[in-house]
C-alpha cells in the first residue's frame, strides 16, 4: 500500500486546495492526466485546449520543484497506441498499473470537480477499482454547495440579490458598521453607460503573457493534434501560472477597474477587452483566489482610487454571480442540463463557428471569439446569446457552443449562465425575465449598427435588422407564457400596438431568417 493518490484536475490548479491537506510527501502522490476526450466532448477552441494543458504542465512542474511525486500523463501530437480517451479510463489504467506493481493507493482524494459528468466518471472509476474516493469541499469559493442548498430551502423563487447580500454580510465585504457601503447594496443602475459617439478613446491594453517554453510546446501540440478545431492560437497570451494571474489582477485593478462599472454593459466593435477584467479564466482554473480579487477591489475603493459603483459592480460579479451560478448548477443538476422552457428546437446557426454573417455586432463578437477564445459578458448575453434566444435555438446546442469556445468555460459556471441567464431555458430560476431585446438595444449600447447594412429600427423588408424582426416574433410566439411575468408588461404592451397584418409579415420574415441561418 502506498498512501493516497491525490487527483488534480485541469480546473483545480490551486496549491492551497483542500486536496493537499495532510499530504505526506513520503507516501502520497499526485495524479494528473491530459486526455483528448476533455477537448473533444465539445468541439473545443484551440485556445481553450492550450490554456488548460499549459496550466496543468506548469502546475506539475511547480509540484515537482517541491519534490512532490506527480504521476502525469501527457498528450502527444500523435495519439499513442492504447491512449485512454477519457479521464475515467486514464484513471482506471493508472490504478490497474499501480495494482500490478504493488503500489495501489489506500485511497483517492479529489476536490469537488467542476462538472457533474466528471464527478460521476471519477466515482465510477474508483468504485470499479475498489479504491475509496474522498471528495473534499472546494474552499476556493466563498460559499459551499450546502450553503446554497440551505439558502434555497423553502424559497419559491431564487434570486441573486439575496444570496449576494448574505455573502457580503458573512464575509464583511463593502460594509460600514454592518451596513452596505454608501447605503445601497447594488449600484447596477449607475453601471449601464454607453460610450459617446466618438468611442471609448484610448483604452489601456491588458498585460500580455508571452508564451514560455512550456506554453510554446503546448501550442505546437494543439496546432497538430487538434488542427481541425475552431479558433486560432496566433494571439494566445493567457495567464497560465499563479504569478501570471496575480499580475493580470494587479493590471486590471490599477488600469481598468475605475471605468469598469460605468461601461460594463457597453460594446465597441474592434475593442474586445474595453475595461473588462479578463480574470474569469484564471479564477476558474483556480490560479487566482477570489478573496484576493475582492479584497483588491475594495482596497482601491477605500483608498479613494475607484468609485464605489465600479468596486461594487465588479465585486458583485465575483462574490455574487460567480457563487450564485455555482449554487444553481449543483442544486439542480443533473436534470438542469435538459431544461427547455421555451421548447426551442432550431439548430445553432453554422456562422457561429465561422463569423460569416452580415450582422456587424455578431460578426465582431464571433470573430474575436474565434481569435481569442473570449468575448465579454454583455457580448455573450446580448449579442450571441440574444440572437440564439430570439432564433429559437436548442438551448443544449447553445450550451455546448459556449462550453467549447471560451477559455474560461467550465460547466458549473457556463451552463447556468447559458441555459438560465441567456436562453431562459430554466423558466426563470436564474433570471427573473428573458433577456430579450431588439436591434434598438444594440444601437443604443454599441457602435455596431453604424455602417451595418441592416436598420435596427425596421422589422420587415430587405433592410430590416434580424434582431428586430426576431424580437417581435419572439414576443408574439411566447406571449401566453410571457404574460404571466410582470416584468414583461411594457414589452408586451408595445407588442399589442402591432396589428395582425404586421405580425404576419414579421412571422414570415422571421421564419425566413431562421431557415436561412439553419
Residue ranges and their predicted role:
Residues 33-35, 132-144, 412-420:
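A generic structural motif
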Residues 38-39, 169-282, 460-468, 479-518:
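A eukaryotic "domain-start" boundary segment
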Amino acid at each position: 500500500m502506498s498512501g493516497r493518490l491525490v487527483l488534480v484536475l485541469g480546473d483545480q490548479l490551486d496549491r492551497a486546495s483542500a486536496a493537499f491537506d495532510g499530504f505526506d510527501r513520503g507516501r502520497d502522490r499526485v495524479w494528473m492526466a491530459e486526455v483528448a476526450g476533455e477537448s473533444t466532448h465539445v468541439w473545443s477552441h484551440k485556445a481553450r485546449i492550450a490554456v488548460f494543458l499549459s496550466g496543468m504542465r506548469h502546475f506539475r512542474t511547480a509540484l515537482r520543484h517541491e519534490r512532490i511525486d506527480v504521476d502525469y500523463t501527457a498528450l502527444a501530437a500523435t495519439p499513442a497506441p492504447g491512449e485512454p480517451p477519457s479521464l475515467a479510463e486514464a484513471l482506471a489504467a493508472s490504478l490497474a498499473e499501480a495494482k500490478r506493481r504493488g503500489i495501489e493507493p489506500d485511497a483517492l482524494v479529489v476536490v469537488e470537480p467542476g462538472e457533474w459528468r466528471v464527478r460521476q466518471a471519477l466515482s465510477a472509476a474508483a468504485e470499479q477499482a475498489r479504491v475509496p474516493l474522498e471528495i473534499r469541499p472546494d474552499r476556493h469559493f466563498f460559499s459551499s454547495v450546502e450553503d446554497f442548498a440551505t439558502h434555497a430551502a423553502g424559497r419559491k423563487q431564487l434570486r441573486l440579490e439575496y444570496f449576494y447580500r448574505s455573502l457580503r454580510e458573512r464575509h464583511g465585504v463593502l460594509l460600514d458598521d454592518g451596513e452596505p457601503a454608501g447605503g445601497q447594496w447594488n449600484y447596477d443602475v449607475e453601471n449601464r453607460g454607453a460610450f459617446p459617439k466618438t468611442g471609448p478613446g484610448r483604452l489601456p491594453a491588458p498585460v500580455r503573457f508571452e508564451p514560455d517554453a512550456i506554453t510554446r510546446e503546448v501550442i505546437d501540440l494543439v496546432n497538430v493534434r487538434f488542427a481541425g478545431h475552431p479558433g486560432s492560437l496566433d494571439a494566445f497570451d493567457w495567464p497560465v501560472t499563479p504569478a501570471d494571474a496575480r499580475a493580470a489582477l494587479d493590471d486590471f485593478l490599477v488600469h481598468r477597474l475605475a471605468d469598469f462599472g460605468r461601461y460594463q454593459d457597453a460594446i465597441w466593435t474592434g475593442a474586445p477587452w474595453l475595461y473588462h477584467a479578463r480574470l474569469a479564466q484564471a479564477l476558474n482554473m483556480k490560479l487566482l483566489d477570489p478573496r484576493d480579487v475582492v479584497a483588491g477591489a475594495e482596497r482601491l475603493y477605500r483608498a479613494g482610487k475607484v468609485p464605489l459603483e465600479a468596486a461594487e459592480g465588479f465585486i458583485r460579479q465575483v462574490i455574487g454571480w460567480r457563487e450564485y451560478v455555482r449554487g444553481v448548477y449543483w442544486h439542480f443538476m443533473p436534470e438542469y442540463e435538459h431544461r427547455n422552457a421555451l421548447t426551442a428546437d432550431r439548430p445553432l446557426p453554422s456562422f457561429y463557428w465561422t463569423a460569416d454573417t452580415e450582422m456587424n455586432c455578431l460578426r465582431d463578437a464571433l470573430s474575436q471569439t474565434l481569435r481569442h477564445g473570449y468575448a465579454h459578458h454583455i457580448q455573450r448575453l446580448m449579442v450571441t446569446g440574444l440572437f440564439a434566444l430570439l432564433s429559437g435555438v436548442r438551448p443544449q446546442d447553445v450550451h455546448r457552443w459556449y462550453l467549447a469556445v471560451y477559455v474560461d468555460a467550465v460547466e458549473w459556471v457556463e451552463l447556468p449562465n447559458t441555459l438560465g441567464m441567456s436562453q431562459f431555458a430554466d423558466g426563470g430560476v436564474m433570471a427573473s425575465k428573458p433577456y430579450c431585446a431588439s436591434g434598438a438595444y444594440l444601437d443604443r449600447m454599441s457602435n455596431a449598427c453604424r455602417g451595418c447594412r441592416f436598420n435596427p429600427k425596421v422589422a420587415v423588408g430587405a433592410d430590416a435588422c434580424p434582431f428586430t424582426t426576431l424580437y417581435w416574433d419572439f414576443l408574439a410566439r411566447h406571449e401566453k407564457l410571457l404574460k404571466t411575468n410582470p416584468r414583461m408588461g411594457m414589452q408586451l404592451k408595445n407588442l399589442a400596438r402591432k396589428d395582425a397584418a404586421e405580425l404576419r409579415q414579421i412571422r414570415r420574415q422571421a421564419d425566413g431568417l431562421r431557415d436561412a441561418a439553419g
